[in-house]
Amino acid sequence: MSSVFTVKIVGPAGAGIKSGGLLLSRILLSHGQHLIDYSEYPSLVRGGHNTYQVSFSHQPVSSIHYQLSLLISLEPNHWQLHKTELTKKSLVFGPDAPLVLPLSDLVKPIGGHIYANTVALGVIAYCFGFDPSICHSEIINTFSLDSPNLTAFDAGFQYAQNNFIQYQDIFKIHSNAPVKRALIVDGSEAFGHGFLVGGGNFYAAYPMTPSTGLLHFLAQKQLTHPITVLHPEDEISSASLAVGAAFAGARAAVGTSGGGFALMNETVSFCGVANLGVVFYLASRPGPATGLPTWTAQGDLLHAVFSGHGEFNKIVLTPGTHAESYQAAIEALNLAARFDVPVIVLTDKLLAESSASFTPPTYIPKVVSSPRHLPGSDDSFYMANSYEHDQNGFSIEDASLVKKVVTARLSLSKKIVKYLPKPVFYGSDQAKTLILTWGSTKMAVLEALNMLDNPSKIGLLHFPSLWPINPNWALMFKPFKNILVIENNATSQLSTLLASAFPFKPTSTLLNCDGRPIYPEQIVKYLKPYVS
């Protein structure tokens, strides 16, 4: 198993923790490291306690880790909140930390506390043996050739050299050549790249954490891509605009989080009856109501699957990694176009806002389209009617005709199942215990399996789509003695969903409902009885 290092920067909001962390990630990428990051922040503009952490290795790393290699606090009274994450080997720097770092004194001649985050990067670079010239290049690319951040970085590096010489290169990284074409993207940006490659040309959204990043990303792309991005007055308007765009022939999507998606439910139903393919990007956060606006959870699975009133076809995709988020955007657009149904891409704050090293595929994906009755066409006629209707859109109420139309509509689900991404198995054929996951929890489980001394006893089955359910999935569980479900909610919604389709009862579940991710260290501990 390769060494995975985790660095965490903490302090108050407004201290540039996220921007400093992303600069650190770019430095890591330039040293050939694979990485994934995670940030926490309260729902405050200033104040509170913010964090940024990044786990990295010279080999692929799937998830952030809980235990820290190095922790830097930009102000007093912050590092103490993370004592449970420290080990005997952890280094802790800060104004009041075990390894005193007088940031206020170091930044005074540079221009103030705004540069404390870059001073901290200098200390990190010293401890990991980063190439200062590479660090300088990344700082220049991020800011400018004459940026005070260069002076700030050197001040941190020099202070560490003078005061922490015993920690020089204490963490031995394997520097690789930078991965060609590699990017640092969060889950929403990965989805956005896939959306553009897949021919998406209309996006509407009202800002709502944690989906807002996709709105910002695609809005910027209007300058270079044939896409229209709108920010209307609320979520209902956003969904309605996307539906109108789809009716006019666009490959359209709309984005939101749980409370916003609740407002869009009538539109989901309208898409289902009017045969309009729209993609809904649903980035979950803890609920109910406002819940925990800036934290993470997987509590909206059943909400997505059973969204809308009445009975109609819909598709729910559940990507688990940045690469899957990219692919899910392409698949969602194609499925919406092929079957003219609403497609919900369900992610969460952890995946949507965490960045990772990612290399976009070089292939050009196939763009699937279906015959459309476009408004204004001389050779076709169709009404997108919210009433039950016949094939031309005319309202109907005759009992026999209604039954025929409803039966024909719902029968499409058998065909849809054949086009959905299939469950993916990871592990040995000798495994007797099977873990089931969906969404971002896959990342932590994969990392945990890599940390086990005897991983051959454990297999992982990940579901990149969860609706419609293929009843044949039940056959995949038969070879295993133990079935474990791991997900980031309180009630094991995956278990409930599977049990609605066929007899299903897991051996055990590992659940989390505190707004934080499930970490691989938790999973390793949970799996001990099954690998001993």
Question: Can you annotate each of these PLM segments?
Answer:
Residues 1-15, 22, 32, 141-306, ...:
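Thiamine diphosphate
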Residues 2-67, 198-233, 436-443, 448-452, ...:
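Anionic-ligand anchoring segments at beta-strand to alpha-helix junctions in alpha/beta enzyme folds, i.e.
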Residues 71-73, 122, 295-342, 531:
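Conserved thiamine diphosphate
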Residues 82-99:
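ADP-ribose/adenylate-binding Rossmann-like module
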Residues 96-141, 489, 493:
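Short alpha-helices
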Residues 115-121, 132-173, 369-396:
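Cofactor-/ligand-binding subdomain signature composed of acidic, glycine-rich
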Residues 177, 184-198, 328, 333-532:
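Flexible, low-complexity linker and terminal segments
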